[in-house]
Amino acid sequence: MQDDSIEASTSISQLLRESYLAETRHRGNNERSRAEPSSNPCHFGSPSGAAEGGGGQDDLPDLSAFLSQEELDESVNLARLAINYDPLEKADETQARKRLSPDQMKHSPNLSFEPNFCQDNPRSPTSSKESPQEAKRPQYCSETQSKKVFLNKAADFIEELSSLFKSHSSKRIRPRACKNHKSKLESQNKVMQENSSSFSDLSERRERSSVPIPIPADTRDNEVNHALEQQEAKRREAEQAASEAAGGDTTPGSSPSSLYYEEPLGQPPRFTQKLRSREVPEGTRVQLDCIVVGIPPPQVRWYCEGKELENSPDIHIVQAGNLHSLTIAEAFEEDTGRYSCFASNIYGTDSTSAEIYIEGVSSSDSEGDPNKEEMNRIQKPNEVSSPPTTSAVIPPAVPQAQHLVAQPRVATIQQCQSPTNYLQGLDGKPIIAAPVFTKMLQNLSASEGQLVVFECRVKGAPSPKVEWYREGTLIEDSPDFRILQKKPRSMAEPEEICTLVIAEVFAEDSGCFTCTASNKYGTVSSIAQLHVRGNEDLSNNGSLHSANSTTNLAAIEPQPSPPHSEPPSVEQPPKPKLEGVLVNHNEPRSSSRIGLRVHFNLPEDDKGSEASSEAGVVTTRQTRPDSFQERFNGQATKTPEPSSPVKEPPPVLAKPKLDSTQLQQLHNQVLLEQHQLQNPPPSSPKEFPFSMTVLNSNAPPAVTTSSKQVKAPSSQTFSLARPKYFFPSTNTTAATVAPSSSPVFTLSSTPQTIQRTVSKESLLVSHPSVQTKSPGGLSIQNEPLPPGPTEPTPPPFTFSIPSGNQFQPRCVSPIPVSPTSRIQNPVAFLSSVLPSLPAIPPTNAMGLPRSAPSMPSQGLAKKNTKSPQPVNDDNIRETKNAVIRDLGKKITFSDVRPNQQEYKISSFEQRLMNEIEFRLERTPVDESDDEIQHDEIPTGKCIAPIFDKRLKHFRVTEGSPVTFTCKIVGIPVPKVYWFKDGKQISKRNEHCKMRREGDGTCSLHIESTTSDDDGNYTIMAANPQGRISCSGHLMVQSLPIRSRLTSAGQSHRGRSRVQERDKEPLQERFFRPHFLQAPGDMVAHEGRLCRLDCKVSGLPPPELTWLLNGQPVLPDASHKMLVRETGVHSLLIDPLTQRDAGTYKCIATNKTGQNSFSLELSVVAKEVKKAPVILEKLQNCGVPEGHPVRLECRVIGMPPPVFYWKKDNETIPCTRERISMHQDTTGYACLLIQPAKKSDAGWYTLSAKNEAGIVSCTARLDIYAQWHHQIPPPMSVRPSGSRYGSLTSKGLDIFSAFSSMESTMVYSCSSRSVVESDEL
């Protein structure tokens, strides 16, 4: 850009000189025109300044012709300010302008305006590829438009002047604007013609700091179109102001303030009301509102997941002043996502974002689909089967793989720019967002026709997409296979419960079930086995017999490696990326553990680096074994077309949709990487040929149908038994095989639903070469391995495969990791904590990791004694049946001790334990078993705890020892807590001893079990990234059962599977009662319903007895015992009385024993409510004026009533003078008037009210004059209740017999008053 400006500088200088002459002639050579002011602060109006267009870096003498040395130096300073211009520096620039002398402004006023112009100029660069002739249009030389030309060229001069000094600061600053004038002129014309502008997401990157960041030229063009509109409007104002100024006189002595005007105060956009996240049901109307302010009014754009939204029939964008709204007329699943609103003006940008969740889907559902479709489209041509006898040359498939990865990498960059609301660390990046299983699938065993439920829990941000697979085949939601996914109840508990319900299982449903959760940050899977017991014995050996199907493999026996021994190796290719080691991940059913695949693709790793061993994908078990489509080094290839390891593998997909083989390879890479740390590679490589390669295929594979063994001189052979079966092996040119590695095939027999692991105990030693024979007669062979200098040649071994068409070997070729791999990459980062092969020895007798149950050492010794003997086909056939029987037994039964047996619990028990774990993971804990401390704000990469090995269920007899063992990994090292039946076990507990090893293995040991130890044991691991737990059940049986169990343990090896299966229910029939749920002490109200609920387990189902204070509770009208379908027992008491208070004890009893719990029930007395009742009514009375009078009444009620007094139906306030109200606890109420006046005469009413009701009574008060004596009425009245009534009725004057104070107790009782009061 700078070079273009320099090359065009000469023509600019010439144009400015011509413009200067034309302007001088137009002004009549008036000297005052030099000081002509401009009304637009963004431009300048000096003809001399216009002529100063000297251009290049080497044309400074041209500038000196128009400027003095002092002005030239000042131009340099102002040009530097123009490059580094920042809106926050306006005040400093204003002061700088004031410091210029009037003389300088008179001769060079352009210098005063230069900073103001450059404020907008950096936002107006355009393409520099336009024709240079654009600057020489005739309109710039016209005298009629000389003012406009002068103003435009003067602005260009400042830009040209600034370009002279860019080279001095280019090493520390790359200017974002001030490109050459040719492209700018054309861009301005385009803006005037199109009257449109485009705004990019990259507008967020506009810096307000004094040092701008580099921005590509193509993005700068889009960044400034809006600013050009503002600038064009100012230019039009400048033309009008200039024409007005041309008619007036401007003297050289004008005030400097007249040379420029202050720019209107502006402010960047700011959202006063931000968008709010919402969750709405599908089909409803959604509206997002925000309010943004800014000067000038900002331009607003809407985006959904990084894509700009425009007005359409479905989406309406409305602006009402500062209020901006986005309305979705009808929301559907595809509308779920993150919506952002960006506002920008020439002073800056601002944005706000919100998540829209459509009920029933997650925000991640709208992501990843294009990549998935693209991957499927690329993979479809590769899913082609070849005949068994087809030979093919295997070309590298790197170009295809590179095309596969190109698009996702771009998507990753866009996703990183979009705002997120994930948990962030100190660096502002998400700590971790990959999915994590907080509850994994459990292995299940069921009978035909039963209901089976697989359940797991997963969390991740954004919400992961969950898919279910059976033997690698995707399961769709159907009436037979119901897929349920419960969304998080709140943001505080982001767990999703994923469930697969099989309404009715059959024998063919047996197999491996996988639940895969994925979002844009990674993929994680949980695997479990389902075993369906059919009507026939699935282990019938006769169904597995075959005549002539054998497979021979050369392998290396595990043996201790000398500290300085050099394992055979070869030279590495330039950049080996994806590596693996052949490992058997299938254990016997009795000890199989949950498989876990985790793909940690952390945001800080998405920076354009190549995919390599740093890809961070780890897996612990291979899934989808029947899938023909395989992947090597991240590439999708056909089975007979593996890629060459010489080529560099493509980068990792941004949203990986990994199949089982790729995950298996990456996991094996971690295993071998740690193994190499323990066995360093040699300094001098030597050749180590190993056939069955699919990663290095420079020669065509030798494929033959002969049933004989075929020896190939090279190690480039590759064969297929059937198009579906795939045999990868080690890499010829990139293998570093340590003496402790032991490749083992894992065979899967789908029709019989039994997985068999080929152990070394059943392998027969053969010649030092490798052969692989299949029913089709295809053969794969390896040459003998040359011995190492310090290592004897390991004897290879052979195993036989009956009925080869029913097995599919599942293995991954071991390719070592480069010794120069960075430790910072996720693979090396996880290699120290994830499952690995121990150094010495790496495997047990079965070729499994040492933690798996191994076979008797005697059997291994017997096999080793036969190792020097050659083996032929006859010997293999003779031992075939024995091998099959041994494999079946070792897969089906675990090698357990008589006193500690592992067993399988029912699905009901499993769900109960899941409930306990779910509650514990959300309950505060008291203490941990160790002194591990975690930072409040974690730093670096963090990984939530993961169980590499889970707790098992044990059945022991009283007095026997038992040990619960599991292995936990996580970063940072998790804290560990142990619980029994939901109650935390203290680390000071002497009975239960807790231990923790350095490799993450945790154990709980009970030396001598008692009946109280029976229950559920749970271990919970926690670190700042989350919590995870798993449980194991301990069944403690009484001594009479021990002999039966011992005999069963001694004879179970000689029984068939049918007998073993028939025997299991007999053992499970004796299950001591165990309370899974029990109520605590309760307080209940008398007269209400009281319910005591408990849940108990046991076989046979126990009987419950309730005791109250030691006496049995018998069922009657108010006491009922109920049992619900869920197994909850309830004692109902309705209504509750005081007699029901006391200590309750519930006893559960069955054949094996009993269990009980107690609680205290307190009964709160029932509150008595009674409506008010008048015991003594108000009495009519009359008193002389001036005397006191008392109106009395007595009312009772429960609770005590509240009294209200009224006179002539108007409430009497308590503050009225001469009137006071009194009452006591006995219900006595009194209204005292002292002294009485004429105005007090009238009808008085007393109302008594409580919660139960209200009652009232009324009486008449008469006031007489002092001389008046009451005359008895002529008519007879009934006797009054007053003690003075009889005297009054006889005409006696009571007032004459008592003092004035005593007269207040007198009640007048005329017949009229009494009768009327009674009626009221």
UniProtKB/Swiss-Prot annotation:
Residues 559-575, 784-797 have a biased composition (Pro residues). The keyword Repeat applies. InterPro entries: Ig-like_dom (IPR007110), Ig-like_dom_sf (IPR036179), Ig-like_fold (IPR013783), Ig_I-set (IPR013098), Ig_sub (IPR003599), Ig_sub2 (IPR003598). GO terms for molecular function: actin binding; cell-cell adhesion mediator activity; cytoskeletal protein binding; muscle alpha-actinin binding; SH3 domain binding. Residues 168-182 have a biased composition (Basic residues). GO terms for cellular component: axon; cytosol; I band; intracellular membrane-bounded organelle; nucleoplasm; nucleus; plasma membrane; Z disc. Residues 240-258 have a biased composition (Low complexity). Residues 649-677 are annotated as: Interaction with NEB. Disulfide bonds join 290-341, 456-515, 1094-1146. Residues 269-359, 435-531, 945-1029, 1073-1162, 1172-1262 form the Ig-like domain. Its main location: cytoplasm. The modification Phosphoserine is found at residues 101, 131, 644, 759, 813, 818, 867, 907, 928. It is found in: Cytoplasm; Nucleus; Cytoplasm, Myofibril, Sarcomere; Cytoplasm, Myofibril, Sarcomere, Z line. Residues 19-68, 84-145, 165-271, 554-655, 763-805, 844-876 are annotated as: Disordered. Residues 1-522 are annotated as: Interaction with CARP. It is linked to Congenital myopathy 24: An autosomal recessive muscular disorder characterized by slowly progressive muscle weakness and atrophy, mainly affecting the lower limbs and neck. Some patients may have mild cardiac or respiratory involvement, but they do not have respiratory failure. Muscle biopsy shows nemaline bodies. Belongs to the myotilin/palladin family. Interacts with TTN/titin, NEB, NEBL, ACTN2 and CARP. This is Myopalladin.
